[in-house]
Curated annotation (Swiss-Prot):
Keyword Transit peptide among UniProt keywords: yes
Family statement drawn from the similarity comment of this UniProt entry: Belongs to the universal ribosomal protein uS13 family.
Keyword Magnesium: no
Region (Disordered): 129-148
Transit peptide extent on chain: 1-27
Protein name: Small ribosomal subunit protein uS13m
Subunit structure as annotated in this protein's UniProt entry: Part of the small ribosomal subunit.
Any one GO biological process: translation
Gene Ontology MF, one: structural constituent of ribosome
Lineage, uppermost ranks: Eukaryota, Viridiplantae, Streptophyta, Embryophyta, Tracheophyta
Location within or outside the cell: Mitochondrion
Name of encoding gene: RSP13
Functional summary from the UniProt entry: Located at the top of the head of the small subunit, it contacts several helices of the 18S rRNA.
Length: 148
C-alpha cells in the first residue's frame, strides 16, 4: 500500500516538473535548498525569479546584479550558477515562510485587538482608505453556509 503511494507521488512529481499543455512544454527547475520553489526554465532569469512568492521586479534585478550573472535563460545556467542562486535566495524570506510570517503578524494584530487587527477581522481596509464609495472588494459580504 505504501509503495504504491510512493510511486504515485513520484509520478505526479514528474508530471508537475515536465508538463505539456496544448503542445507547449513547460519544465521547471527546483530551487530547493531550504528555499522551496520552482522556476520555469524557458524564461530569462529575471522573469523566472518573479515566479517565487515574495520576489518582484526590483528584487529579481537586484539578485541578478549581485550575482553578476547574465540575464540568460534558466535552462542555460550552469550548476555553479544555480548553486549560487540557491545560496543567495536562502537569505531572503520568500515562499511559504513569507506567507506564514505575514499570517503570524496579522494574527498578532488581531490578538492584541488594536485598530488594524479589528479592521482585519471585519474585512475592512486598515490603512485609512475611504469605505463609503470604494473598497468594494474588501467590504464584500462573506457567504455563510445555511444562509440565503
Amino acid at each position: 500500500m505504501f509503495g504504491s503511494a510512493r510511486i504515485l507521488s513520484d509520478v505526479t512529481l514528474r508530471l508537475r516538473q515536465n508538463l505539456s499543455v496544448h503542445g507547449v512544454r513547460v519544465q521547471n527547475i527546483n530551487i530547493g535548498g531550504g528555499v522551496g520553489g520552482e522556476i520555469p526554465d524557458n524564461k530569462r532569469l529575471v522573469y523566472a525569479l518573479q515566479n517565487l512568492h515574495g520576489i518582484g521586479r526590483s528584487k529579481a534585478q537586484h539578485i541578478v546584479a549581485e550575482l553578476g550573472v547574465e540575464n540568460k535563460f534558466v535552462k542555460d545556467l550552469s550548476k555553479r550558477e544555480l548553486y549560487s542562486i540557491r545560496e543567495l535566495l536562502s537569505k531572503y524570506l520568500i515562499g511559504n515562510d513569507l506567507k506564514k510570517c505575514v499570517e503570524r503578524d496579522v494574527g498578532r494584530l488581531v490578538g492584541i485587538q488594536c485598530y488594524r487587527g479589528i479592521r482585519h477581522v471585519d474585512s475592512l481596509p486598515c490603512r485609512g482608505q475611504r469605505t463609503h464609495t470604494n473598497a468594494r472588494t474588501r467590504r464584500s459580504r462573506k457567504t455563510f453556509s445555511g444562509s440565503r
